[in-house]
């Protein structure tokens, strides 16, 4: 039911193309995955999302547990039917909220007690509970519960959190019983190579359908992020899909692909879109700026997204300056399409054996726009 098929390999790097087969369709990798935290990519309908070329989205277990609740989603027929998205869905475990809501939680080896940011009540999540929630949601891919520590934690604290992550992985595997849902484990270990290696080997030993690398892009320096991207894949199984969590910049994606990663997610396309910022090549355009008032060109004349085919920078500037919701939607749509197009172009370059010429971030200060 779940299979990862490697379809081509780069001759100079570890980059590869593949097909991740799921019960709700296939994901052609490398692929960017938009974030739909509450079973919605903010401001965008499922039909609009399909137009961007998106093949898989991410939703958040913790937030869906709080509202509307996994039982209601299950009663509706599962998350795909609930949100009218027929393609694959991955649900993260809530491990990131262990990091992002650190001031509102208490952590023990049994799980995490959160203070509900909505009403102040307390919610306890154990690895077993997190898996049960994801089984009720009915996602294609469930993530094992993990402890994502802050990048400022010292090595001893990182090691303690890693042991907890590994213990929770064991419990997650023992609890997960849904044959039509894949379970991925998560590699942690902070910026410490020995801990990353240990975690990668331990997580790989479970022979799960896929594997993720977490604890990246949580405040580290660019150099530290690149170190993890370069180092960890050598300890991961080659024939499994590799998911690098929280990465969405062109340079980091291309570097990650060169090291054998396949799937990526990030909130930036929609977060920036909601603030009027559009992706253009490897730059960002703040369309609130007055210089776009009389600019009747599209965001990107080479882009075939619905926004760029139909609307000018001047019109988008007008919408954003007047706080019109349509502006946020149109820019977010473009930003998602931009990253999907980028990963699609990487796939083509790998198949044509020109990936290192067109997308190698270590060879140029910017990624050549004409290549995609």
Swiss-Prot record:
Substrate binds at residues 92-96, 146, 188, 215. One of its GO terms (molecular function) is tRNA-guanosine(34) queuine transglycosylase activity. The active site is at residues 92, 265. It catalyses: 7-aminomethyl-7-carbaguanine + guanosine(34) in tRNA = 7-aminomethyl-7-carbaguanosine(34) in tRNA + guanine. Zn(2+) binds at residues 303, 305, 308, 334. Its cofactor is Zn(2+). Binds 1 zinc ion per subunit. Residues 246-252, 270-274 are annotated as: RNA binding. GO terms for biological process: queuosine biosynthetic process; tRNA wobble guanine modification; tRNA-guanine transglycosylation. Its EC number is 2.4.2.29. The keyword Chaperone does not apply. Keywords: Glycosyltransferase, Metal-binding, Queuosine biosynthesis, Transferase, tRNA processing, Zinc. The keyword Cytoplasm does not apply. Pathway: tRNA modification; tRNA-queuosine biosynthesis. Belongs to the queuine tRNA-ribosyltransferase family. Homodimer. Within each dimer, one monomer is responsible for RNA recognition and catalysis, while the other monomer binds to the replacement base PreQ1. Catalyzes the base-exchange of a guanine (G) residue with the queuine precursor 7-aminomethyl-7-deazaguanine (PreQ1) at position 34 (anticodon wobble position) in tRNAs with GU(N) anticodons (tRNA-Asp, -Asn, -His and -Tyr). Catalysis occurs through a double-displacement mechanism. The nucleophile active site attacks the C1' of nucleotide 34 to detach the guanine base from the RNA, forming a covalent enzyme-RNA intermediate. The proton acceptor active site deprotonates the incoming PreQ1, allowing a nucleophilic attack on the C1' of the ribose to form the product. This is Queuine tRNA-ribosyltransferase. It comes from Prochlorococcus marinus (strain AS9601).
């Amino acid at each position: 039911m779940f299979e990862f098929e490697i379809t081509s390999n780069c001759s100079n790097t570890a980059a590869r193309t593949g097909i991740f087969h799921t019960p709700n369709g296939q994901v052609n990798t490398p692929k960017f995955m938009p974030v739909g935290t509450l079973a919605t990519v903010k401001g965008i309908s499922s039909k609009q999302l399909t137009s961007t070329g998106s093949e898989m989205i991410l939703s958040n277990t913790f937030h869906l547990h709080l509202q509307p609740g996994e039982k209601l989603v299950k009663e509706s027929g599962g998350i795909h039917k609930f949100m009218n998205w027929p393609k694959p869905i991955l649900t993260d475990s809530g491990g990131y909220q262990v990091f992002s809501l650190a001031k509102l939680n208490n952590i023990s080896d049994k799980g995490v007690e959160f203070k509900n940011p909505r009403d102040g009540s307390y919610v306890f999540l154990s690895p077993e509970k997190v898996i049960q929630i994801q089984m009720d949601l009915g996602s294609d891919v469930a993530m094992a519960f993990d402890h994502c520590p802050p990048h400022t934690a010292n090595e001893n604290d990182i090691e303690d959190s890693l042991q907890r992550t590994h213990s929770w992985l064991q419990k997650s595997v023992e609890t997960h019983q849904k044959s039509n849902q894949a379970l991925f484990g998560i590699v942690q270990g902070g910026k410490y190579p020995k801990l990353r290696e240990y975690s990668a080997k331990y997580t790989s030993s479970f022979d799960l359908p896929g594997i993720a690398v977490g604890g990246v892009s949580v405040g580290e320096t660019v150099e530290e992020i690149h170190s993890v991207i370069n180092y960890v894949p050598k300890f991961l199984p080659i024939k499994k899909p590799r998911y690098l969590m929280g990465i969405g910049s062109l340079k980091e994606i291309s570097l990650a692909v060169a090291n054998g990663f396949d799937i990526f997610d990030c909130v930036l396309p929609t977060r920036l879109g909601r603030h009027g910022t559009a992706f253009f090549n490897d730059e960002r355009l703040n369309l609130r700026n007055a210089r776009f008032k009389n600019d009747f060109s599209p965001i990107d004349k080479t882009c075939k997204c619905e926004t760029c085919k139909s609307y000018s920078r001047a019109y988008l500037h007008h919408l954003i300056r007047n706080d019109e919701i349509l502006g946020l939607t149109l820019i977010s749509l473009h930003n998602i399409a931009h990253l999907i197009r980028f990963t699609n172009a990487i796939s083509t370059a790998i198949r044509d054996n020109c990936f290192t010429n067109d997308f190698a971030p270590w060879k140029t200060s910017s990624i050549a726009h004409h290549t995609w």
